[in-house]
């Protein structure tokens, strides 16, 4: 029997597919739709210290090759999501989940994570170091010194399972530098990647979205080669205890297969989930299993990270 079961940290999942933070995860109702689908788990909207309305609309647009957005981290506040995942866990009948959070300053991040430490929640936390769409706030993980200092401080008080959502890197030296930092800490996972920041899509002489004069994060087909490169680069550089979640350009079982081939333990779906809804997980799971059967693979470990190079 072909299995797409996987593991992140000490958490086991019966499938390897889930939503990407930002899609189908704003409300409890949306999260429960993902929960009831064939997705392995869900990740919440990235929760900030306070409720955020996000950027002015229109702030999202589908395009021929994917999507562009400048949402600006709209969310119901981290406590809304923390209370929800904590309550779900208490029922004992639900999947392990991911709680996505970030502060708009190091002090806010510390306040949020200390609140999670003091809570009953024992699941996975994804710290978003890579949102490109908050005006005046840089993507933290592009500043290696700040990232190192932030993680060093976090792990003086935070002992629950924690991973980080990364922006795309484009330089081999940056892969080396980032991995050297991440390997210093007891991270459960890294998520590669968030959208490619500050793209521009034009239609009939006009930008598609309002914030930042049309500049926004690019997702979908545009990002898949970059996402695969980041997944594989970090798979080769990170210690085995740090699992990799692959995100970017996944709309078919073949796309998911390639992420796993590059080293991903789980795969997140964003743009196409927004377009098709949670039924996407059943289709992509079926397509992935078909590929595995054709190639003679019984489980993800049979091919994870086994990308072949040209001689």
Swiss-Prot record:
Its EC number is 1.3.98.1. It is an enzyme of class 1 (oxidoreductase). Coiled coil: none annotated. Substrate binds at residues 45, 69-73, 128, 194-195. Its cofactor is FMN. The active site is at residue 131. Binds 1 FMN per subunit. Pathway: Pyrimidine metabolism; UMP biosynthesis via de novo pathway. Transmembrane segments: none annotated. The keyword Electron transport does not apply. It is found in: Cytoplasm. It catalyses: (S)-dihydroorotate + fumarate = orotate + succinate. GO terms for biological process: 'de novo' pyrimidine nucleobase biosynthetic process; 'de novo' UMP biosynthetic process. Keywords: Cytoplasm, Flavoprotein, FMN, Oxidoreductase, Pyrimidine biosynthesis. Its main location: cytoplasm. GO terms for molecular function: dihydroorotate dehydrogenase (fumarate) activity. Pfam families: DHO_dh. FMN binds at residues 45-46, 128, 165, 193, 220, 248-249, 270-271. Homodimer. Belongs to the dihydroorotate dehydrogenase family. Type 1 subfamily. This is Putative dihydroorotate dehydrogenase A (fumarate). It comes from Streptococcus pyogenes serotype M18 (strain MGAS8232).
